[in-house]
Regions:
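Small-residue (G/A/S/T)-rich helix-start motifs and N-terminal tracts that mark the onset
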Residues: 3-160, 168-185, 190-311
Length: 311
């Protein structure tokens, strides 16, 4: 296993290029060792992946809803919707403001679309009828958002993914934490993480606080970055092995939200969805970067490469 010190950004200058070598320990010995942290190599997502049955129809793969978009930020909704569909979900409905209706219907014809509000989403209703819910990409921050987010959290019993501006609303109103359904998936980048859970002085403290907060609120926390870290309320933490610097680009997180929401809607338990989704997101990014270079990679390339990642 990698040592924790090799996996945090602040130590990169001291580590150089790190390779994990086989020193001959038996698989039985390694599997018997209980460790808090795990390195997510390909064996974990392969074990989690569920092939599609031959005699299947779209109803077998769930109905997801994405609450996303606002005036000037409909691209986030489009990116998230495309990724959700590429993840294998059976049906997708997007809730967007009226200004985004034509944009979404034109850019993602495979998705259904409902509207509320004109330039931003003013309310969210009937959320309980979906198999999974993703909230946040491009919604902006407006006074009404806190009210409908609270209502959604009170009504929903289906798995949730919370990202982007929905995380910032949650950070401004920490009383909403008590309403989060068990095993909700939060996907903050490091700055969003500190707004949610408090300042940290180094990467080791961030990992520790993520583990503590995951147990405290019974949620899954995906701290995005190189070697994205998934903190689980069962006391385990996972470092992702896929991804590259080219994925540090606008919209990459919206793609991840779509993937996670789609996997949840298909019936993957939240922990499995988080691990598989983060791994696939990074692998699709690696495939895209190999084609276009990390510098030229854009978020849409990630969702377009999901097919190869599944293969």
């Amino acid at each position: 296993h990698y040592k924790l010190a090799f996996l945090v950004p602040e130590n990169e200058v001291h580590c150089g290029e790190v390779h994990l070598l086989n020193i001959g320990l038996s698989w039985e010995f390694e599997s018997s060792e209980s460790a808090v942290y795990a390195w997510m190599d390909p064996a974990i997502p392969r074990a989690l992946y569920k092939p599609r049955p031959i005699f299947a129809h779209k109803g077998n793969f769930g109905h997801a809803q994405l609450i996303a978009g606002s005036y000037g930020m409909m691209g986030a909704a489009v990116l998230s919707a495309r990724a959700c569909l590429r993840s294998g979900v059976g049906k997708l409905t997007c809730l967007v403001p009226e200004c985004g209706y034509t944009v979404l219907q034109s850019a993602v014809p495979e998705a259904m679309c409902t509207v509320n509000g004109e330039r931003f989403i003013a309310d969210a209703t009937e959320v309980e009828k979906y198999d999974a819910l993703g909230i946040g990409p491009g919604i902006g921050i407006h006074a009404s958002h806190r009210l409908w987010l609270e209502k959604v959290l009170q009504q929903v019993s289906t798995p949730l993914v919370i990202d982007a501006d929905a995380l910032n609303i949650l950070a401004r109103h920490p009383e909403l934490f008590s309403l989060l359904p068990p095993l909700t998936i939060l996907t903050p980048h490091p700055k969003e993480f500190e707004r949610l859970f408090g300042p940290v002085s180094n990467d080791f403290d961030r990992i520790g606080l993520a583990m503590e907060s995951s147990r405290k609120y019974n949620i899954l926390i995906v701290v995005k970055g190189h070697y994205s870290f998934i903190a689980c309320p069962d006391g385990k933490g996972y470092f992702n092995s896929t991804g590259n610097p080219g994925m540090a680009t606008a919209g990459s997180g919206d793609v991840l939200t779509g993937i996670l929401t789609g996997l949840l809607a298909q019936g993957y338990p939240p922990k499995q969805a988080a691990l598989l989704g983060v791994y696939l997101h990074g692998l699709a990014g690696d495939i895209a970067a190999a084609k276009s270079s990390p510098e030229a990679l854009i978020a849409g390339d990630i969702s377009n490469s999901l097919g190869e990642a599944f293969m």
